[in-house]
C-alpha cells in the first residue's frame, strides 16, 4: 500500500458520503418540522384552557378539558419521541464522518510506520499553500479529465505521489491538531461519571483548537483524549458502553440522548453497538 493507493481508496470511499449525510440531515429537518407542529398544537390547546379559566374562573370546568389534556399529552409524548429520533439521526451522521476519518488516520499511521509517509513532526513547512494546491491539481487533473499519463512499469507517477503525500500530510496535521485519541488505559469502574471524576480536570471549550502533544509529552495530569461520537474531550456527565470492543468507549449524555443515569446493574450499549449486540444475541438463541 502506497500513498497514491490510499488517496484513491478514500476518494472512492467518500464519494457517497455527502449524499448519505445530506439524506440524514434532510430526515432530521423533517423530524424537526413535525416536532414544531406538535409543539404548536399542544401549546394552542393549553392556551385554550387558560383562556377559559381567565374568563370563567377556576371553579368552572371546561366542557372538553379532559379531551384537550389527552391531546396535549399525546403531542408531548410525540415531541419527546421525535427529539430522540433527531439525536439518533445527528449521531448517525457524525458517526459516518468519524468512521471514515478514523480509518483514514489508521492508514496514515501504517504509512508512517512503513516509512512511506514522513511523520508530521518531521515534515518541513517549506511548501507554500499555492504549491500544495498545484501539486494536488496536477496529480488529479488527469483522472478528472478522463486522460491518463504513461507510467510504464511504475506503480505511480512522481506527480501523483506528490499530490497524495501533500493531501496525506494535511490530514496528518489535522489529526494532530485535533489530538488523536490514543490508548487511554481507562478501566470502567462505573458506567456513569462526571468529567471531574473522569479525569479530575476541567477543560475549556477551546481545547479542540489547541494542538495535542504526542504521548509522553502531555504530563500525567493532562488528558486531551477525544471521546464519544462528537470526538471531544470529557465534560459533564459521561457514560461507558458495555461493549468491550466499542470504538468510542465513553459518551457524553447529551450526545446519546440520556437524561438520567442507568441503574448499576443495567446494561447499556451506544447507538452504534446496540444493533450489533442485538444481532449477536439473536444468533446465540
From Swiss-Prot:
Main subcellular location: nucleus
Domain of life from the UniProt record: Eukaryota
Coiled-coil stretches: 19-54
Annotated site residue numbers, Histone H3K4me3 binding: 227, 238, 242, 250
GO cellular component, one term: nucleus
Region (Disordered): 138-218
Protein name according to UniProt: Chromatin modification-related protein YNG2
Gene: YNG2
